[in-house]
A protein has these predicted regions:
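ATP-binding glycine-rich phosphate-binding loop
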Residues: 18-40
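A cross-family kinase active-site recognition segment
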Residues: 125-183, 205-207, 307, 361
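A glycine-centered beta->alpha junction motif in the catalytic cores
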Residues: 58, 109-126, 168-176, 290-309
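Active-site activation/catalytic loop segments of kinase-like enzymes and analogous catalytic loops
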Residues: 239-270, 286-302
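Active-site acidic catalytic loop and adjacent metal/ATP-binding pocket
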Residues: 33-53, 86, 193-243, 351-361
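ATP/Mg2+ or Mg2+-diphosphate-binding catalytic cores
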Residues: 174, 292-361
Length: 361
């Protein structure tokens, strides 16, 4: 079964092989990294009339990494943190192997795949400070579970290694045009030096199990509360990695939004204010790693079709400009202001948390 050519019948056959028979209705969902399908079932499974089947990109994760992600999701669900965990697969026909305890990962038809419940919702609207505080409480609860033990197999955020890997991949692959290469390389090396210096200054840095890619597109608002449905990028890293993508604007606006998030977050986890200085370094790393991700996936026809601008002189010129802006931003915001939420962040008492209508109680 060719990963890039998965069709509805192949998806139905794969689900049927683990005891989930579809009724013929299959809808492909948006996903660049994996192939994801919504499938309606003939008979409901664990109360679900439709499920989401995820076929993992070959070579992207090891079995151990996928199972560790599944285990984390199940642990969060057991702690009543609103996530959509993988479903336990009921059986395996000959030729299909089930992995995990309980079994949540199927290996068969030349692929690895898992199944979860379908979960609908809308993107959060965070103009309301109350919604920001609510989202902060949600992330705080997720981190309260995440800090109990480290990931063994998932990625551990390492700015030096991650940045250098992205830089090497882009240079060795010849993705940067000769006309843009000198200016881009200079900006990139200067930016990575600033990133590494910021992380060095924040040591010792406490890390924990994270969502890893916590932006508004990965958070669903449902029944008056936030949920997450995608833990593909779960990693070990500093708490701020799950917070910084939820704030935007100039320095003052971001500081205010972060303070509001932390009013909720601090009810469950203390926050090390030194990590505020990592927001712009993390943004810089994300920019560079995004370019490297596009480069790594360029042989997949989906990527040239959806990212035609990648590799053009204009793209790299823009990247150079943005990297220079990030160098300045790191210098200007090496330490963000500590706001009035500090007493909540540093005096968190999980036993007295107020759920305040989150839907967690």
């Amino acid at each position: 079964m060719d990963y890039s050519q998965l069709d509805p019948q192949q998806v139905l056959d794969a689900l049927d092989a683990v005891g989930l028979r579809g009724d013929g209705r299959v809808l492909q969902l948006n996903s660049y990294e994996n192939r994801v399908f919504q499938v309606f079932l003939e008979d409901a499974h664990e109360g679900h009339s439709a499920v989401v089947a995820k076929f993992y990109r070959p070579g992207r994760w090891s079995d151990a990494q996928i199972l560790e992600e599944h285990s984390f999701a199940l642990e969060l669900a057991a702690a009543e943190v609103p996530v959509v965990p993988p479903l336990v697969l009921p059986l395996a026909t000959p030729g299909v192997q089930l992995l995990g305890t309980p079994p949540t990962l199927a290996c068969g038809f030349g692929h690895r795949y898992g199944v979860s419940a379908r979960c609908a919702g809308r993107e959060p609207e965070l103009e309301d400070p109350a919604a920001l505080r609510q989202l902060g409480r949600f992330i705080g609860r997720l981190h309260a579970v995440g800090r109990k033990r480290p990931f063994e197999h998932r990625h551990h955020l390492n700015p030096r290694a991650d940045g250098q890997r992205a830089l090497t991949l882009l240079l060795d692959g010849g993705f940067v045009p000769d006309t843009e290469r000198p200016a881009w390389l200079q900006a990139c090396e200067q930016a990575l030096t600033a990133v590494n210096a910021a992380f060095d200054a924040a040591q010792p840095l406490t890390t924990l199990r994270l969502h890893g890619d916590c932006h508004l597109g990965n958070v669903l608002w449902r029944d008056g509360a936030p949920h997450v449905v995608d833990l593909d990028d779960a990693m070990q890293g500093p708490a701020v990695q799950d917070l910084w993508m939820l704030v935007s604007g100039d320095h003052a606006t971001m500081a205010q939004q972060l303070n509001t998030l932390l009013e909720g977050y601090g009810q469950f986890c203390a926050f090390d204010d030194r990590q505020r200085a990592l927001i712009e370094p993390l943004r810089t790393l994300r920019m560079l790693r995004h370019s490297a991700w596009l480069a790594e996936r360029w042989s997949d026809p989906t990527f040239p079709r959806n990212f035609p601008f990648f590799g053009t002189a204009a793209y790299w010129n823009q990247q150079t400009t943005q990297l220079r802006e990030q160098i300045e931003a790191i210098a200007e915001t090496a330490r963000m202001d500590i706001g009035p939420a500090a007493r909540l962040r540093h005096g968190a008492d999980e036993g007295t948390a107020n759920f305040d209508g989150d839907g967690f109680a």
